[in-house]
Curated annotation (Swiss-Prot):
HAMAP family: Upp_B (MF_01218_B). It comes from Shewanella oneidensis (strain ATCC 700550 / JCM 31522 / CIP 106686 / LMG 19005 / NCIMB 14063 / MR-1). Keywords: Allosteric enzyme, Glycosyltransferase, GTP-binding, Magnesium, Nucleotide-binding, Transferase. Disulfide bonds: none annotated. Belongs to the UPRTase family. Pfam families: UPRTase. The gene is upp. Uracil binds at I193, G198, D199, A200. Gene3D superfamilies: 3.40.50.2020. This is Uracil phosphoribosyltransferase. One of its GO terms (biological process) is uracil salvage. 5-phospho-alpha-D-ribose 1-diphosphate binds at R78, R103, D130, P131, M132, L133, A134, T135, G136, G137, S138, D199.
Length: 208
């Protein structure tokens, strides 16, 4: 599985700011979108382009345009919504496919409760966004769902990943690409990433 830890200075700086324990909801939300934007830049670097001729201000001009499959952004509810706007800054015409999954706090297993996907998933590149890749359960369940709907080109964008989650994702879906702003140390006994960001969903929405 292709794993890319984006080590650009801006990404490292912004993730560092997000680790502050007393960060405000407003600031955390802004940074989540900003890092999501930077991860999108990296994740789309291999998109193919084609040369087309358009009418410029002084006559015809050849320009590059992205070709191939269209894109759908897949936020995993609820925390994934915090990264979605950052992706749409670069791909404003992308379709949005929503997947609702929460993690059972006792078993740490993913529990799906909602889905609304683009009708032509087999013709699209899916960019899944979720702030945390902890155990990997929610991400794996989401990818399972997308593949059942015919999607064959999938990239996952996360702010922070745990080694345990990366290992689980690779075992389940080695064909998927993972882009993360940081690979952290480990999970604690409750399945939270250390040092991590805390509960990203609570911090993005300001509610528990």
């Amino acid at each position: 599985m292709k794993v890319v830890e984006v080590k650009h200075p801006l990404v490292r700086h912004k993730i560092g700011l997000m680790r502050e324990g007393d960060i405000s909801t407003k600031r955390f939300r802004e940074l989540a979108a900003e890092v999501g934007s930077l991860l999108t830049y990296e994740a789309t670097a291999d998109f193919e382009t084609e040369t087309v001729t358009i009418e410029g201000w002084n006559g015809p001009v050849d320009v590059d345009q992205i070709k191939g499959k269209k894109v759908t952004v897949v936020p995993i509810l609820r925390a994934g919504l915090g990264m979605m706007d950052g992706v749409l800054e670069h791909i404003p015409s992308a379709r949005i496919s929503v997947v609702g999954i929460y993690r059972d706090e006792e078993t740490l297993e993913p529990v799906p409760y909602f889905e609304k996907l683009a009708s032509d998933m087999n013709e699209r590149i899916a960019l899944i966004v979720d702030p945390m890749l902890a155990t990997g359960g929610s991400m794996i369940a989401t990818i399972d769902l997308l593949k059942k709907r015919g999607c064959t080109s999938i990239k996952a964008l996360v702010l922070v990943a745990a080694p345990e989650g990366i290992k689980a994702l690779e075992a389940a879906h080695p064909d998927v690409e993972l882009y993360t702003a940081a690979i952290d140390r480990c999970l604690n006994e409750k399945g939270y990433i250390l040092p991590g960001l805390g509960d990203a969903g609570d911090k993005i929405f300001g509610t528990k």
